[in-house]
Amino acid sequence: MARYTGPKSKIARKFGDPIFGADKVLSKKNYPPGQHGNNRRRKTSEYGLQLREKQKAKYTYGVLEKQFRHLFHRAQRAKGVTGELLIQFLEARLDNVVFRLGIAPTRSAARQLVSHRHITVDGSVVNIPSYSVKPGQVIGVRERSKSLEVIADALTGFNHSKYPWMEWDQSSLSGKLLHMPDRTDIPENIKEQLIVELYSK
């Protein structure tokens, strides 16, 4: 499946959750898209709920099936709670870290910044959105990219104390992943246990 590039409000309505950020359409039409979306509330099967939660996580983080499955198997092999580790690994993706630091307004925009070589890790350019950031690594904006309007606009008024597992230095336009976040600190409304159950079948 290719990465979705269509109307984001339609996907947000599908899940009944603003997975791409604040959504004016969702606030007015918080029911599935389609002609009869507001009246069609069929009971969803257990498998359907599990699949829906996986799709929701993939859309939220902008991850394709192969990448998502790889992260799940990595979480399975690691020591700890598989579902929580999966969410932590998704959070540690470079594109997500760039988004969380406020360098980009959305994960999609963050992915573009990384792909177009505007982002550095420990001083070296990294253009792989799926790169896994480790605690202690410094994520910065490339010197020649610091004047980009999209970055300046995103950083304006951004609350850098929002995510306690990160640190930001405005003078150098760089931030650091201090530690992996606790699941309770991650605001995404994802029921990761349903994803674990789906892959465990």
Curated annotation (Swiss-Prot):
InterPro entries, sorted: Ribosomal_uS4, Ribosomal_uS4_bac-type, Ribosomal_uS4_CS, Ribosomal_uS4_N, S4_RNA-bd, S4_RNA-bd_sf
Domain S4 RNA-binding stretches: 92-154
Entry keyword 4Fe-4S: no
Molecular function GO labels: rRNA binding; structural constituent of ribosome
Biological processes per GO annotation: ribosomal small subunit biogenesis; translation
Residue span of region Disordered: 26-47
Keyword rRNA-binding: yes
Keywords, ordered alphabetically: Ribonucleoprotein, Ribosomal protein, RNA-binding, rRNA-binding
Highest taxon in the source lineage: Bacteria
NCBIfam families, per the entry: PRK05327.1, rpsD_bact
Subunit structure: Part of the 30S ribosomal subunit. Contacts protein S5. The interaction surface between S4 and S5 is involved in control of translational fidelity.
Family to which the UniProt record says this protein belongs: Belongs to the universal ribosomal protein uS4 family.
Role summary: One of the primary rRNA binding proteins, it binds directly to 16S rRNA where it nucleates assembly of the body of the 30S subunit.
Record's protein name: Small ribosomal subunit protein uS4
Phylogenetic classification of the source organism: Bacteria, Pseudomonadati, Bacteroidota, Bacteroidia, Bacteroidales
Gene name linked to the record: rpsD
